[in-house]
Design a protein with these regions (language model features):
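Short alpha-helix boundary/capping and kink motifs at helix termini
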Residues: 57-119
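A sequence-level detector for short glycine-anchored, His/Arg-bearing signature motifs
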Residues: 113-131
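Surface-exposed, charge/polar-rich loops and edge strands
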Residues: 4-57, 75-76, 82-83, 135-172
Length: 357
């Protein structure tokens, strides 16, 4: 089988040395390429889904995720994208085209790595997935993506946490097999991290949300997520459960993608509970997609959080805590590193100048 490499972006071919690797061509539904390792796909899907009903929010989410990806507004290997407006114009054309047309493999194909993670073509894949169309992929079976463009990548690039929440909710809507683990505040931070590590060892942790809440708020949250169970009809039972899972730590909600069936997830839940030593008061994991969507809406949207966060004072405290925490994170992981790089370049330039003189 011969491959026409002109169907791929030259930059991608060169970056991965694709001409040196074995490949196979396949026709697949684009939705099979929606994986949590490509968090950006869900920002693009959010844009498509909201551009006509809430254009300002759609453009804000899309533009900010592009800036996190490409701070200079340029796409490597492309001369036609010299700013966010060019990205939007190009994407609008792609959306318009695939709304009415199938993917034409005579024009292009989408490269993917051995695990089915796309190496290029995110805009095409997002549009095709939205309209439930097929795409021709060329899979390189001994190539791995050079970077994991998951939620951590975008947080570490300074994308605001509120926009990350919006994208994460979109991800939960589109990807099957996503569960939510509520790791209760009764666990100290070390044990909470142990729980996340255990989940990540077996599955792929797709997003983490930490929420600072008091006992009243946690009681409301407990009553909400367990509301289908009879015991929640008694407010004292709800309060008792909340008291047992309350502690000094944040409520940590970890969304993870599981390829295995529910029985395996339940087994993993029991193992983590045993490891943390608090039984059912260690963590809660959803059993199905509706439950996961329910929790996602409760913790990833402002309207959802306002339903259970203590309205008397916690909203302000939570916002202040979240703002300070986010700004410190951005300074430590983005601005401080950028400053060190800038200083290094200046010192290096001065050193070279001194050597020449």
């Amino acid at each position: 089988m011969r491959m026409d490499y002109s169907l791929l972006q030259p930059h991608t071919v060169e970056l991965y040395k694709l001409k040196e690797h074995n490949f196979s061509l396949k026709r697949v539904n684009a939705r099979t390429l929606l994986v949590v390792q490509r968090f950006d796909l869900f920002a693009k899907l959010f844009y498509i889904d909201n551009i006509n009903t809430n254009p300002s929010e759609a453009e804000r989410v899309y533009a900010d995720h592009i800036k996190a990806f490409n701070p200079d507004g340029r796409e490597p290997g492309r001369d036609d994208k010299n700013g966010v407006d060019d990205f939007i114009t190009s994407f609008d054309e792609i959306i318009k085209h695939f709304k009415d047309h199938d993917f034409d493999e005579r024009i292009s194909v989408v490269p993917v790595d051995r695990n089915g993670v796309i190496l290029d073509g995110a805009h095409r894949v997002a549009a095709l997935a939205y309209f439930n169309r097929e795409v021709t992929i060329v899979q390189f079976n001994d190539v791995d993506a050079v970077c994991n463009f998951d939620y951590n990548y975008f947080k570490n690039r300074g994308l605001s946490w509120s926009i990350c929440d919006t994208i994460a909710l979109e991800m939960v809507k589109w990807v099957d097999g996503v569960y939510a683990a509520c790791i209760w505040p009764s666990n100290n931070q070390n044990n909470q991290q142990i729980a996340v590590s255990e989940l990540n060892e077996q599955y792929q942790v797709a997003y983490i949300k930490d929420i600072r809440c008091n006992l009243n708020s946690l009681s409301s949250f407990v009553g909400y997520i367990y509301r289908a169970q009879d015991w929640t009809r008694n407010s004292l039972s709800v309060r008792d459960k909340a008291s047992r899972v309350y502690g000094k730590s944040n409520l940590r909600v970890a969304f993870f993608k599981a390829e295995s069936n529910l029985d395996d997830v339940l087994k993993e839940k029991d193992e983590i509970r045993h490891l943390l030593g608090k039984g059912k008061d260690s963590l809660h994991i959803t059993d199905n997609r509706p439950e996961t969507l329910d929790i996602a809406n409760a913790v990833l949207t402002a309207s959802g959080m306002n339903q259970w966060l203590d309205s008397r004072n916690l909203n302000f405290c939570h916002k202040l805590y979240s703002t300070l925490n986010e700004r410190w994170f951005v300074f430590k992981n983005v601005q401080w590193i950028a400053l060190k790089v800038a200083v290094y370049r200046i010192v290096n330039r001065l050193f070279k100048k001194h050597v020449v003189l």
